[in-house]
């Protein structure tokens, strides 16, 4: 795995049991890093609205979706969210490049407002998954890297979904041409066969632990961290991902899937089709002009899901969105079958 991450200059890994664990490790390492660097006041975290970073208190605190947080508040203090670069739904512009610049500038402005000497890290998913497969403009991540460098803030990429091929690139941050300081993995690391997560850090961060400091011991770990069975499954899985070029397949088949999904725009309720690789969403609206969303669990959306399931296509519902995240071995033939089923579902579902 570390050989795969050599271009990002990642040199150490902390194993855990899943994505939430991996994020928690990243947040703790970030705070400890700045204490070791003699900047103990750098404790705050920035993230994006619509973000999802797991179910631990740290991860929930940097998540940007209210439903994931509300029942457990108050959460960790010192966590702030900025507007997501959501092209279909934002208050700024319909121009992608302009939106990316605006959102990056928002981060810079908020860091200045809080004080750069108090901010530890910015954490984000290269493509926001559970929030609705929000694909940022191409300039967003490079600009975020510049902002983090300018204000001496660590950049954490939550690659729990995007890691190991789903975007068409081996890693989501690599897809955008950006090198984070810390990366979080799970899911694709061993295709979920055995629970495993990983937090990996680059040389810059590792160097802080070379100091003879009473705060240097990393007080973090889980009962099953680095479990041999989980790691063996990961090795076998990653060998297949790499040798069979599953990232390449995800990119090729994903592009074809998006093209075919364009056929759904003939229906009055399909407001947006978006995605990268095999990470796709179809957003449903009551009106294409106003973009009024369907309420969660609306009978119309549930009927579409039911028909698809009965016909053999399992589709996740997230609010008013159909989430499509098939295996990386998906083929164009599979896409054609899925589209045929979805067309049937939309034709048969009643919308008043």
Per-region residue spans from a language model:
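Conserved N-terminal phosphate-binding loop of PLP-dependent enzymes in the Aspartate aminotransferase
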Residues: 1-352
């Amino acid at each position: 795995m570390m050989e795969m991450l050599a271009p990002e200059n990642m040199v150490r890994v902390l194993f855990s049991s899943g994505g939430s664990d991996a994020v928690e490790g990243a947040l703790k390492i970030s705070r400890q890093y700045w204490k070791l660097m003699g900047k103990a006041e750098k404790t705050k975290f920035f993230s994006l609205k619509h973000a999802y970073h797991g179910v631990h208190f740290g991860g929930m605190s940097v998540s940007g979706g209210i439903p994931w947080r509300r029942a457990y508040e108050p959460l960790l203090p010192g966590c702030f969210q900025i507007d997501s670069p959501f092209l279909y739904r934002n208050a700024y512009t319909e121009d992608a490049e302009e939106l990316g610049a605006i959102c990056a500038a928002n981060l810079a402005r908020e860091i200045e407002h809080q004080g750069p000497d108090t901010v530890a890290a910015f954490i984000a998913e290269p493509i926001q998954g559970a929030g609705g497969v929000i694909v940022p403009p191409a300039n967003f991540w490079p600009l975020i890297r510049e902002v983090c460098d300018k204000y001496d803030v660590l950049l954490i990429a939550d690659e729990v979904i995007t890691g190991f091929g789903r975007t068409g690139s081996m890693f989501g941050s690599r897809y955008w041409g950006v090198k984070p300081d810390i990366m979080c993995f799970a899911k694709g690391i061993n295709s979920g066969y055995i629970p495993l997560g990983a937090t990996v850090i680059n040389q810059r961060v590792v160097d802080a632990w070379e100091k003879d400091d009473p705060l240097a011991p990393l007080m973090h770990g889980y009962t099953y961290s680095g479990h041999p069975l989980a790691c063996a499954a990961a090795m076998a899985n990653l060998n297949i991902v790499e040798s069979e070029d599953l990232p390449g397949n995800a990119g090729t088949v994903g592009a074809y899937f998006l093209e075919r999904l364009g056929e759904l725009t003939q229906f009055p309720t399909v407001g947006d089709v978006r995605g990268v690789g095999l990470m796709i969403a179809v957003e449903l609206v009551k009106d294409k002009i106003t973009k009024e969303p369907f309420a969660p669990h609306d009978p119309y959306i549930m009927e579409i899901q039911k028909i698809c399931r009965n016909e053999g296509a399992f589709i996740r519902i997230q609010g008013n969105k159909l989430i499509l995240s098939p295996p990386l071995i998906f083929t164009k033939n599979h896409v054609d079958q899925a589209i045929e089923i979805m067309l049937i579902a939309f034709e048969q579902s009643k919308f008043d």
